[in-house]
Design a protein with these regions (language model features):
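N-terminal secretory signal peptides that target proteins for export/translocation
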Residues: 1-3
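Cleavable N-terminal signal peptides of Sec/SRP-targeted secreted and luminal proteins
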Residues: 6-21
Length: 458
């Protein structure tokens, strides 16, 4: 008995020893060999939060300060009409009060939205940190404005109330930091800004909050060697407190996007429209004009829930994740229209989550005959399960060209307990007879999922 029990223990210890012996070198060949922790691919859906001093003017976009300095007419006129002549951008910071910020409510909302990870902007290009950073004196949320640790509060709420993974966004550069401007003037032959500001902040963020995901940005201003990216990532993977679970993106230098990193997002609102050779993400905003909150937003500038669901389905069918951005207000709330979108998305996922979470792309990503039908798949107890998700409710028959039926094929409609009939298509494929339902009996709105098992080509 002792020998039988000790054998699996020995195997476990050997595996553990091998895992602990892996050491990543500070070069991309070594760093890119690190396997992506499985939770990220299984998660599929995240929430992005752009929140900072730019949320106070809440005009134009989160690039308000830069556009003001660049002389953008709409921003210049806005300032002339509403603020005294000597008003500076720093004067907005004390007005960033976040007085209604309740991280517990936010955490509950994100859970209701069906999100499996959250990425909070901890520092955007304005340089203001949402945590009490030692390296951003008097330009952080504890010293000025809220007088709160906005990052720590949300991290605690997420971890205490949900099963959501907590991530942080950090911008490598800052528009007007004198150290960065001097490095730029020196053509990056110096990196004082990186050594005295960027890297200390990154180490501080990771050690203090132990995030599951680190979303880097602002990389386009310099190459990876200027940012010391590979050295930092080697520490992150080898020595940091999150070395076994952390996931990063590809924004570590203007020469790294779509080439290196844990997952690729390549560009904002990236949708390749095809399978990619690497795990990828589409980060997008419900407000099509801005990542930060705008007081001037109109309904026609927002993603409708049907558009959002259709995008989610398409992205997942191609093997991607969808990171959905909302911009909170300066007083710490999420506007009702954005909350509604998130809750609607969650209600759809309550019915159709099996076709999204932990799925893999199928042989076909969209049907070759019927437009608006997308496929996902996952391993089931009796073989591969294939999900056909249609963004148009079929009036009677849904004809699909790509699934090949067998005598063992079964078809069901997610959220519906009744039987679903089908027959082989005349020219191949399958013809699915949509249940004759009253509108109040249809299991969900916006898109519907037919689950197929026992296909010959699954």
């Amino acid at each position: 008995m002792y020998g039988q029990m000790s054998r699996p223990l020995i195997v476990f210890l050997l595996i553990l020893s091998v895992c602990q012996s892996i050491h990543y070198e500070p070069n991309w060949e070594s760093l890119d060999s690190r396997p992506l922790p499985s939770w990220y691919d299984e998660a599929k859906i995240g929430i992005f939060l752009h929140w900072g001093v730019f949320s106070v003017p809440s005009f134009y976009s989160e690039w308000f300060w830069k556009r003001w300095k660049d002389g953008e007419p709409s921003v210049v006129n806005f300032m002339k009409q509403n603020y005294r002549p000597d008003f500076t951008y720093a004067d907005f910071a004390p007005m960033f009060q976040t007085e209604f910020y309740d991280p517990n409510k936010w955490a509950d909302l994100f859970q209701a939205a069906g999100a499996r990870y959250v990425v909070q902007v901890t520092k955007h290009v304005e340089g203001f940190t949402s945590w009490p950073s030692k390296y951003s004196w008097n330009w952080n949320a504890m010293d000025v404005g809220p007088k709160r640790d906005l990052v720590g509060e949300l991290a605690s709420a997420i971890r205490n109330r949900t099963n959501i993974h907590f991530g942080v966004y950090h911008c490598l550069y800052e528009w007007f930091n004198p150290l960065f401007l001097q490095d730029t003037a020196n053509k990056f032959q110096t990196n004082d800004f990186v050594m005295r500001k960027t890297l200390p902040e990154l180490y501080e963020l990771v050690n203090k909050y132990e995030p599951d995901l680190l979303w880097s940005d602002g990389d386009w201003m310099g190459p990876d060697w200027y940012w010391n990216s590979t050295i930092f990532l080697a520490w992150l993977y080898n020595e940091s407190p999150v070395k076994d679970k952390i996931i990063v993106n590809d924004r570590w230098g203007y020469n790294t996007r779509c080439k290196h990193g844990g997952f690729w997002d390549c560009a904002d609102k990236f949708n390749p429209g095809k399978l990619m050779p690497h795990k990828w993400e589409d980060c997008m905003a419900i407000d099509k004009q801005s990542w930060g909150y705008r007081r001037t937003t109109t309904v026609d500038e927002l993603y409708s829930i049907k558009e959002l669901i259709a995008l989610l389905i398409e992205i997942v069918s191609f093997g991607g994740n969808l990171l959905v951005n909302v911009g909170p207000t300066s007083y710490g709330t999420i506007a009702p229209i954005f909350e509604e979108r998130l809750r609607q998305m969650g209600s759809w996922l309550d019915v159709n989550g099996d076709a999204i979470y932990a799925t893999k792309p199928w042989t076909y990503q969209n049907d070759s005959m019927t437009p608006g039908v997308w496929y996902t798949s996952k391993a089931g107890t009796s073989g591969t399960e294939v999900y056909a998700i249609t963004i148009k409710w079929p009036s009677s028959v849904l004809t699909l060209a790509d699934p090949v039926v067998s005598i063992d094929t079964t078809v069901s409609l997610l959220g519906y307990s009744g039987s679903v009939k089908y027959k082989p298509g005349v020219a191949g494929g399958i013809e699915i007879y949509a249940p004759d339902l009253n509108i109040e009996d249809i299991p969900c709105l916006w898109a519907w999922t037919f689950k197929m098992t026992g296909l010959k080509n699954a």
